[in-house]
Amino acid sequence: MNRYEFLKGLHRVYRPRTYLEIGVNDGRSLALSRTRTIAVDPAFKVTAALHCDLELVKATSDDFFARPRPMRSLRRGVVDLAFIDGLHLFEYALRDVFHTERHTRWTSVMVLDDMLPRSVDEAARDRHTDAWTGDVYKVAAALAEYRPDLLCVAVDTTPTGQLLIFGADSRNRVLSHSYDEIYAKYVVPDPQQVPQDILTRRHAVDPVAFLAADFWHELTHARDRILRRGGGFEQLRPQIEAAVRSCARVPVPG
């Protein structure tokens, strides 16, 4: 399943009421939205037909998030589904994550693209290949270290994988407050030391099976009822973790 097929499946099973896209390019992913949408890109070149109520913003994501009330055109200013495919460098992707999280609820879903590079060359910070993920894959490790309260799921989509983030907390400031420390630890010169589990997608879930998991119904139900994070995510997290174990290409330890 490719990235666009998986995103289409997410729109189908999760039925977001609002959608944020960072990094529009030619609009192929944006064309999947059928809901109120904000799309951000400093140099978009949309060629796909669009089918959503859209605010298209020509700006960098940093400049967009620096605006007062950047999500004011969305229902209650809350992002249900976010697709982050901006500049392919770790620090930019990390900032996009914690800036987006401030406009979410725990039932929101964030999707990061290009999280499973296929080679060390493809993961280089200094691009020298045609296909390029950069070092954004390291965001998963940073979240595991600094935000274990989040549940991150690697998805084996073609060509370069994706990461889903569940359990967002709009009040959490750990990532922004620790940004300089995280940057110093994770931003290193090429060649990048890409873990073998990333290159082999050892613990990534099968996208078709994961979209068919039962927890999506419970997640959308909790979202629509506006259940609080405390009890809601604590109850739902084991269901998502069980889906990860059953859908992983290779069994996930623990």
Predicted regions and their residues:
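A short alpha-helical cap/connector motif
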Residues: 1-83, 87-111, 115-254
